[in-house]
Structure formats: C-alpha cells, structure tokens
Amino acid sequence: MDLKKPENKGALTSKIAELANNISTFLKNILGSDQHKAALLYYWLRNYLRYIKQEETFNPKYFPQFKPGDIVKVDFGFGIGSGIGSEFGGLHYAIVLAPSNSKNSTVTVVPLRSLKLGKESPKTLYKSDVYLGTELFTVLLDRSGEMLDKCGTFIKEVENTDPKTITVKDIARFEKQLEEAKNLLARHDIIMKEVSRLNAGTVAIVSQIRTVSKIRIQNPRYSKDALYNMRVDRQATDKIRAVMKDLYNIK
C-alpha cells in the first residue's frame, strides 16, 4: 500500500497513531534498563521533529559564512551501533572542512571528541582518528581571555571618566558597552564550561566526516554566539586532510 496516495489517507492516519504508540512503548521499556539511551533517543526524536518544522522557514543566508577550520557545535543525531565503525551521534564540536557561503544550506564537517584519559593515548588511537592535542582547548581559552580583556577596557573607560564632564552621549555609549559586556560575559561562561572538558586533548574522527544541514548547527548561528569566527590553525586541518587522503586512497 502506497501511503502517499490521497485515497490511503485514512490508513496513513492509523499507521501514524500506531507508530506513535510503538515509540512511546519502546522508550518506556528501555527507560528502566538504560535511561541514558532513552534520553538520547528522546532528544533525537524531539530535535528531528523541530528541524522538520524549521525547514519551512529555514534560510541559510542568516547563518555565518563558514570557512575551513571554523569550530562549530553540531547535533549529529542518534548514533546507531557501538564500537569501531558505528555511527557517531549526539551534540559535539566539529571542524568545518570546506567553505560554505550564505547560499549553501549544508556544511561539511569532521566531528571531534575528547581524548579518554586512562583508556587511550595519542599513540593508541585508530588510524582514522587524528589527535589534535590541546588545539581546541587553546583556541577557546584564548577567546575567553579576549572577552575578559574587552570587558576590562569598558570598565576602565567608565572609571577614568570625570563625572563632572560626562555627557548624555557618554551615558548612551556606556549603556551600549554595558550591554555588550553582559553578552561577552555570558559567552565567556559558556566557553569556560566547555574548556574544563577539553584539557586532555581533542580527537578528530575522520571516518565520520559528513555533510550536514546548517539547521543542525547549534553554535554559532549568529555573530554574537560564543563560537562565532573561532577557528583552529592551518596545521590542524592539514593533519586531518593527510589522514583523509591515506584513509580513502586519495592521490
């Protein structure tokens, strides 16, 4: 039966209800034995539904233009399987591998993960994994430092202004700087929470390179986002491309 045909609308309605019930039953059944998996499935289904709804109004021109080396945070969905060769899933950092302008609705990325201390070392990684050292940690830490420095500059300017000579124009400028400082501190807090998880080093999973819809990018979406214009150096992307060539026999 072709459920896409108009005459089968009633049957499709019944199948949708059946599927919804099956999903609910399945999630409740695994909740007791594997809450982590149940939660991941729930997030995936919830987010996928949201992405489908967003497709109707999605316009890539409102996203930043991505360049090779840009750091992004991507929802890779629910990973199927376990062990080597299984599909990578969840919300993770990734590095952009190819330019993607405002007309392109997709972007090609390589997902990243943290090195598992005590379980692996850079020398024991699989050939499809690239150890990037503390590159991501350093980039994020440097950016957070820049944000604090800028906030400090705003504060000094206010402190060095003579209250007797302050103008309406000065007050308007200070209010604008205060709002920017609040945004910078919020972004700084987000970055610092991430930095604490990355000091062991970062691994690029070359076998999981994929092209994803920009709808899946959680950060950065706007110029004010924490990861906006944040990029690893050329050496990191060169390492990844070298492994790509070896892994896929690219001349």
PLM regions: where:
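C-terminal terminal-subdomain/extension
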Residues: M1-L49, Q54-E56, K61-P64, S121-K251
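Short, Lys/Arg- and Gly-enriched loop/turn segments at beta-strand edges
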Residues: G79-L91
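Short aromatic-glycine-enriched beta-strand elements
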Residues: H92, N104-V110
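Short, conserved beta-turn/loop elements at beta-strand boundaries and strand-helix junctions
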Residues: P99-S105, K116, T211
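Short beta-strand-centered aromatic/proline hotspots
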Residues: G89-P99
